[in-house]
Structures are given as C-alpha cells and as structure tokens.
Amino acid sequence: MDDQLKHMTGQVAKGTMTRREFVGRAAALGVTAAVANSMLANHAQAAAHEAPIRGGTLKIGSSGGESTNTLDPALTASEVPLNNLRHLYESLVEVDPNGEIENRMAESYEASADAKTWAFKIRKGIQFHNGKEMTPEDVLKTMQRHSDENSQSGALGIMRGIENMKVDGDNFIVELGVGNADLPYLLADYHLMIQPDGGMDNPGAGIGTGPYTLEVDEPGVRHGFKRNENYWDADNRGHTDYNEVLVLNDATARTAALQSGQVNMINRVDPKVAALLDRAPNLTVKSVAGRGHYVFIAHVDTAPFDNNDLRLALKYAINREEMVDKILRGYGTIGNDMPINASYPLFDESIPQREHSIEKAKEHYAASGHDGSPIILRVADGAFPGAVDAASLFQESAKAAGIPLEIKREPNDGYWSEVWNKQPFCASYWGGRPVQDQMYSTAYLSTADWNDTRWKRPEFDEMLLSARAELDEAKRKETYSKMGQMIRDEGWLILPMFNDFVDGVANNVGGWVEDPNAELSNNKAGIKCWVKDA
C-alpha cells in the first residue's frame, strides 16, 4: 500500500491526479481524509525544501506579452509584465501558497483594535538596484503614486479606501475611514511594488529591490534578468545566474519550445495537449485549482449591452459544462457569472447555479427588444487558451436561441492594450485575488480603474464598505453573498468557467511550489526555482 500511495502522491505533484481523486482513492485503501491531506502537504513540503542549486540559466516561455508592455507596475495587466515585476520588484507583503500573509519589504505589521489604523515596520538595509537604500518614504511615495486619480494604476480601486498615509519613524502608517481586517491582502496586490521615490520620475525604469536586475527589455519579444548580488533574501530567491522570459503567445509555439528544450517552463498549457505533453520524457505538467476565470465581458454603458434582458439571454444561452469539457478538458469547473468560487473564504455555496436554458435565453432575448443586428464579440487566444474555440461554442448555442452573435478574431499582440477595457464586448481573463474584498475592489467598485464591465451600483459600493468593517463573519458572508448575486443577475460578466492553472515544466527544474494564487507558481517560479544541471 505504501508504494501505491507514494505513486499517487507523485501523480498529484505532476498534476495528473487531483487532490480530491487522491483523497478518494486513499480512502479506498483505508486512509482517512485527514491523513491523506497530511501526506500531500508533507510531499509538497519535502519538494519545496529540496536544497537549491546556484547558477545556470532559467528560461520561461510565456503568453501574455505585447510590444506595448512597460515595466511600470501600475500598468501591468498580463502575464509577461507580471513575471517581469516578480524579478525586479517586491511589495510590502505577499500572499503565500497557503493563503497566509508573508512579510517582504515590511518586517512586521500591526493593527488597531478596530482595524482602522495599520503600522507596517519597514526593513532596514535593503538596497534598490541603483544602490539607494529603501526607506519608509519610498513606500509612502509608492502608495501615493498608486492613489493618484491620474495614475491609471490597476490598484487604484484598492487605494481609494485609504484616508491617510504617513511615515512615523521606521513605520509606514495607513489610516482607513472604515476598518478592514483584510488590508494586508489588499497591499499584497502586484501593482504595489516598492520603487525608489515611489517611481514618481520614471516608473518604468525597472529599478526595484528584487532578486534580479534588468539586462534586456524587448517588449513583445524577450526580457533578460541578471542575479542581484546584493539581494537581501538570497537563500530563498534568485538562485540562477540569469533568467530569460520569452514571449510566446501561440500555444503551439510554447509547447514546442518546452519539448525542444528551448525553455525550461511554460504557462497556460493548452488543455487539449496537456495529457500528451505529460507523457513526454523529461517533462511534467503541473495543474492546480484556484481562482482564475475565463470570461466574456461587455460594457453596460454601451448599447445594446445596457439592456439586462439581453445580458440574461446570453448568460442562459452559454453552455458552461460544454466549455469545461471541450475547452478546459476537465482542468477547471463551471462558473456562475460571478468572480467568486469555493476557493475564496466566506463563499456562499447556496447561491443557485445558473443552468444552460435555450428556452429562457429565447424569452429574455425577445423581451430585450433587440433589433437583430449582429452582436460583435472580439476574441483572441491571447485572452485565454482556447478563447476562439470557446467563442465559437458560444456562437452556436446563441444561434440556437436566435441570438445573432458574431465573432471577430483579433491579433494576440495588442489585445490587452487595444481590445480589453476598450472594446464593448470581448473575451477576457482574471487570475482572481486572495480575498473577496480585493477582487471586488479591483474590478467591480464603481470607481475602480479596472472596472472592465463599466457596471456601477452605489448600493454595491456601500455593501463592499460595510463588509470591510464587519467583524462578524456570518454577517460578512451574507453581505458578500448579496454582492455576488447582484453581479450574477445584473452585471455584464459572463463567466462560464474557472480554470485550473496548467503549466509545463522540464524535470531539470527544482524548487517548484504548487501555488493556487496564479500560474507559474504565482509567477514566482522564475525567482524561486533553480536548474538542477546548472
């Protein structure tokens, strides 16, 4: 039995068996769920504590890169820029794979009893890449820049909840109008990377405190990073001499690059080839469930999308189970037109699942009074793997309901700068956030810069603020439930599926840690992993 369990834990690590399957099969062998989960945790911990090897070059093949990309953390919106941020910069705190807060530029933090005032003690002796020592003033200026209404920062919605910020000795102080026990999670947002003088003068310079310094910056092509020899946490990050991120937006090209040894790891393995790729010699497919979701979004302030009956018609028309089966190939779960799933704390499982119903789609489409002109949906596989095929499935099911959905395929390059958040109806992707407050504050608060559906409801904003201040978890959960149902029934988010994060990794890579926060081990694989044959 021991050999069988050992083999099964290895399958979970490779992503060929889910945790649920492991627990079920272990139960058949007489192992309790508690013991089974402990075995998985011990296996992951042992892998994570493998002795690092210093030196060598690590190459990452990643989708989500464009010629318009910048190194300004405020403007980061896709995977390649996010990977770059992890190499160059660090935030006050981070969220670890277990969902706990990990201190980075902050050495410690504490809050007042009402969670309105927070003090983050800033580490001493940490240098930026330009030799300047990081100070609490750099932290303050960074946060002030992201609070500027003209910053276009993806964290602007988060920062609007802050009334005042200041420096007090070694501490960065945050004062809130409404208490928020989740504030550290909000400040872990990847846009809030600490820069010298807050990045006020040159936010795209690439100068941070991270484990690597910038060597090559060719947006849309490649980015190169050299190990920072003065890095403060060298025992845990920055093991390789050099890292390179290659922009490979085409899924077939990414897979070929991994198979040929051109790169050591890739993100967003096409689910159609995942099982086949995992059988290839010297390669492993890593899969972890999380909060990422593939979506179709429209602007509620633009006709004909300002009609809720039309919105509901399309929501009932889409066949979620078909998409999970055919697009995700089982690497995910069905969605419910709200960005929250069971991976989130305080999720309400009693919210009814919206079912595929052609009859209801027809009823709502007729009630919408739409004139029958083509409804244009813009897509590219750069939005998410299989987006074009998913749109085709959507088009067919909409056709069955008499809805004239027309697909317009856009180029991958420029999709995130020219289509997303600009065109009124398109495919999109969200990686999710650690807590509900952050997800809602980033994309659904009326004043959020990344409110990509333009859905604005004062009553929703009020509920978000009241949930922040609510210390009774049952009441907080009830408020979050109402908010989720508002988006589900009134918003312009069509969320057919939550995706697993599916990555491909060469077996000569060590230090991989399963992280449900985002793909490529929360985009930290490049800074935490090493090359075994360096």
Could you describe each region identified by the protein language model?
Residues V505-A534:
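Long beta-strand-rich cores associated with HINT superfamily self-processing modules
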Residues K121, G154-D197:
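Surface-exposed binding/hinge segments that line
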Residues A400, P404-Y415, S441-N507, D533-A534:
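Extracytoplasmic/peripheral linker and loop segments enriched in polar/acidic and small residues
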Residues D96-E100, L187-E244, D250-T252, I358-E359, ...:
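Gly/Pro-rich hinge or "lid" segments in bacterial periplasmic/extracellular proteins
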Residues G61-A113, Q144, I207-T209:
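N-terminal lobe/hinge region of extracytoplasmic solute-binding protein
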Residues M1-E21:
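N-terminal secretory signal peptides
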Residues N230-L276, Q395-E396, P404:
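Ligand-site clamp/hinge motif
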Residues I334-A367, F384-D389:
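Structural transition elements
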